[in-house]
Amino acid sequence: MEINFKYTDNILKVRSWIEELATKKVIACDFEVASFWSDKEKASYAKKLEDSINDEYKLYYRQIIATDGLSHPALTKLTHLSIAWSANDAYVFILANDNITNALLDFLVDTDVLELWHNACFDLKHIYYHTDKFPKHFVDTQLLAKCYLNDASNALCDTSLKALMRDTYGDWAIAKDNFNQNNQYDEKMLEYSATDACATYALFRQMCRQHRQILDYLKNIS
C-alpha cells in the first residue's frame, strides 16, 4: 500500500496540524527514539574509555556507548512522532527542538481523540517521563492482537507490527543503526515512521471489522 505523508520541523505548521488532528475521532501514533548521545559523541566517549584508568569512569563511559533508542527515557531523545488518521495518510513531526516536542506531548495527554499505539508500553513510558501523565483515551493494538491470536506458541502468535501487516505494507523495516539523531531528516526514516502509524491504524480497523463479525455470529447462534 502506498503511503501519503507530509513532514515538518516548523512550529507554526506543527500547531496547525495539531488543530487539524484534534478534529479526528481516531489517530494512530508512533514515536521514533534515539540515544541521547550522537554517534560522534559516543566515539569521543569510546576514546575516553580507552584512556581511562578509573573504574567508575569506565562504567559511565560504557553505559553511554551502549545506549540506543530502547534505553531508559532519561538516556534517549525523541526524534519523530508520526500520526496517521487513515491507513495511508500521516503526518511526521521531526522533533527538532523542545518547542515542537512539548507542543506534541501536550496534545497527546490533553486531547479527547482516541489514540492507537502498537506496544503502548514503549511509547507511553516516554510520554509519562516527560509529562507525568498518560493519554486520556488509548488502545494498545499489540495487546488487542494478542487477545485475538490467543496462542501459547510464540511462532503462531507473533504480534509485532511488521509481522501482522506485512501482507498489506510489505517489508518496511529498517536497520537498528538508522535510529540515531543524524537521520532525523532521512527520507527512508521519515517513510518508515509514517508507515508505522498507518499500519497501526489499518490493523485497528481490521480488528474492529473482525470484532463486529464475531458479534454478528454470536447474535445468530444465540
Where are these regions (language model features)?
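Conserved RNase H-like, two-metal-ion catalytic cores of nucleic-acid enzymes
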Residues: M1-A163, D167
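Active-site-adjacent bridging/hinge elements
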Residues: Y169-N180
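Mixed-charge, glycine-rich, non-catalytic linkers/tails in nucleic-acid processing enzymes
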Residues: P135-F138, F179-S222
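Secondary-structure transition/capping residues
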Residues: E115, A175-K176, H211
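Generic helix-packing signal
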Residues: L149, Y169, Y201-F204
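All-alpha helical catalytic cores of prenyl diphosphate-utilizing isoprenoid enzymes
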Residues: R166-D171, T195
